[in-house]
Amino acid sequence: MTGWFTLGGMPTEHFVYTVHKIRDGGNYCVRSVTVTQIAEKGVCFTATMSFKRAEPSPFRFQHKLDIKKEYGPYIEAKKNMFDHPDMPSQDSWWFHNVHAPKNPNHFNPLGGLHLRKLNMKAYNEYRNPIDRRRLMMYSTRGSMPQIPASVLKAKKPKYSREANLHAIAHIYASDRNSLFVIGDHLEISADARRIATISHTVIFHVGVEELLFSNEPADEPSNAAPTERASGAADAPDPSVTERKWYMQEVWTDRAEGGRGLHRSRIWDPDTGVHLATTIQDGLVRFKDNSSPPKL
């Protein structure tokens, strides 16, 4: 999936999604999507989506990364995942250094996700900007529609449309506070003048059976940000679930010039070490004229 953000949206107006069929093939199908609000003002967002039928593979080849060896000390630095800092919906230098001190009681949690940011200061301190990493652990708020075991075990499983919600949750998580990492790793966050996404690409490398979130446990730590839900809602906690499922996004930047910057990431299952998805984001990133990041 690749989407282009072409016009700012208005939060008080509804969005209209129009889907166009490009091709239906034996193995692939392709769709394009355009999103508008007030039609005469133009398209807010456009995307191309390709979907491939699942098939067995005689091998699995991926970037070799021992997550526990490379990042274990940072993941396990806290007893519980909720002991790591909660990432706000705007994790910018301005929010932490200008807005938050003036508004100490203001907290802007991210809707739909529990998002925890690991402290990577010791890992990044003596590394070049291009080798620095940001790690985010995420899990869904509320329970998700679960796929029956009989479907998962079938030779040719037929998934319901609800199964796509698990993939959509990963796409949503992949673009949270993305471009702020450029200024952070170049040590010029305070010099940011304007930041906006141009395009965002997500490529899944696995089937939906490896992207599943658990239902929400009934017993959560006291420091878990509360989730508001209607009485009797379908996403209510599941008493049979004792531990929630977390995924990890590994983020870095390796290019910035001319008012643009590149955000890259890999999404991992930290329990299995499987590389689930890759993301690439091109962004408009402008800094003060005298900004000077550290040399490589």
Predicted segment positions?
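Terminal targeting signals and extreme-terminal segments of soluble enzymes
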Residues: 1-296
